[in-house]
């Protein structure tokens, strides 16, 4: 875990911030989702899957790319 000089888990803080933004944005950017996927630790995956599942469930026509992201996380 990368920590700054004060013991802060920078990776964890960035992941948490990105997860909040992805959850609150109606259509989160692919760049933001790519970055969070690069930074995810195994413990972070269930929260991210939950966020994506909520988006797919509430969208009348879920995007193909969002569905592909979910499927990629299951393999």
Regions found by a protein language model. Give the residues of each.
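Solenoid-like repeat scaffolds
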Residues: 55-60
